[in-house]
């Protein structure tokens, strides 16, 4: 084995030693998500799993209420408001209660960072209602020590892209260059451009069984993206005016809209157009408004978050002898407007390898994975070299810069300065608007 091969092997073994099997159908994954590498007794694991089920399953939670005077559950806050110095929060299981924010954090910055994490909640039965007796975040702090060791080794071998894929359960050693370039964009929304300050937004229309949903579940559970398989309401997405509660935009780090090929079924065109208008403004200006007629300041939220759209192709509409025009093809998906498409960095219409050919399902423990992504973002922030794609118009030109910066930080050599800008830009444009659906 050569020196490089041995080093690579050691790097991937290190990743493996700090990872766990991630199966989105296995509820026991919560143990790895909140405990990390910490070992606990079997009876403690059973308690945690029951608390988690009570925290995410509203029917199971309700079934517990008549039997106990005290209930413990593990859940995330899905909406909240502040009233009389108390936080009134709604949880995944439907329970709503108030608590002193000092129970979660001593200062507003820490509270803001922790409000979207998994919470341990103990509630007690009062004379009239159930109330929150205890609440605190149970997510372990980011492990920068291990993440730094991994990234430093990856930097030496110019394998940051491979480490990132491996960290999310892909098997980068099985993947060819096409697989890598078709898969990496799923993770780009984790990063922000230091040049344009934009988040990276993507659309992926691809065949089933390629690992999309598994990746989206990791983004949801580890990085607090909000995952939708049907169109959101204004109340859920931005602000619930009836209950005066903030929605997903405030509480999440990104939005994922999956199964979009089904969204036109049973959803009023007028409602969809209103949501589209809100999304278009939010993507571009980081301003999210509750909707027409809402005057309160609290109904307008300023926050920059990335958006991922995903779905499956309408196979019966394809011309098997011709690759479809991307934007014309996307008109079949009623969620897309020209304004939204103009704000998307990368659009893929692709037939990809199925997950059994590119995935090993071993995911870095969340405390290390979050730290690794932060460190890669720092590397992105230090990357300033890019080719000037003068043939592109303003927004598309800025998007090409964002993608170049991220790719270089991931150790993808774009040959900037070695080949013409035109050659670099052509490659970036092909990545930004990719289709291989012709002939399917």
Swiss-Prot record:
Pfam families: BrxL_ATPase. It comes from the Viruses. This is Uncharacterized protein 440. It comes from Sulfolobus islandicus rod-shaped virus 1 (SIRV-1).
